């Protein structure tokens, strides 16, 4: 009976060790970075490759470095010549600093979408309909520049609107 009890105890300990070690080893893909927190304090961004964390003490947040394309929902805008128009946009952006993207803002994707929506309304509200229709490329560049400046502190680079 002692042999069965001690072997089941060893088996239980072995299972717990395997579970803890499986939680300690993470794989970060080539297009991702893992932002590591140790006891709530930032350690830095690691990856790509195999990352070993201290169980229970370390926590990792994965951040994709790939370009994200996001539809900006249609916005009802009144132009400067009081013509109501409905405009939507597509914004392309990517994370250039994973630590800033995790620490500076709670959800960088949602925040970038909100900035793009408000910027779209404000930029188009300053122009009349004819200017908007004839100089769409200039309006897109202005939108891209403003959104990029506002998301820069978050480690986000807006490439195209």
Predicted regions and their residues:
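N-terminal hydrophobic membrane-entry segments
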Residues: 1-161
């Amino acid at each position: 009976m002692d042999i069965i009890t001690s072997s089941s105890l060893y088996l239980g300990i072995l299972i717990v060790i395997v579970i803890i070690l499986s939680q300690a080893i993470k794989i970060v893909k080539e297009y991702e970075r893992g932002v590591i927190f140790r006891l709530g304090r930032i350690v830095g961004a690691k990856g790509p490759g195999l990352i070993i964390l201290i169980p229970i003490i370390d926590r990792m947040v994965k951040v994709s470095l790939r370009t994200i394309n996001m539809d900006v929902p249609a916005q009802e805008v009144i132009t400067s010549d009081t013509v109501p128009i409905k405009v939507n946009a597509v914004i392309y952006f990517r994370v250039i600093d994973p630590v800033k993207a995790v620490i500076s803002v709670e959800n960088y994707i949602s925040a970038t979408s909100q900035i793009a929506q408000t910027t779209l309304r404000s930029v188009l509200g300053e122009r009349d309909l004819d200017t908007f229709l004839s100089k769409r490329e200039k309006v897109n560049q202005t939108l891209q520049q403003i959104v990029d400046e506002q998301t820069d502190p978050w480690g986000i680079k807006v490439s195209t609107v």
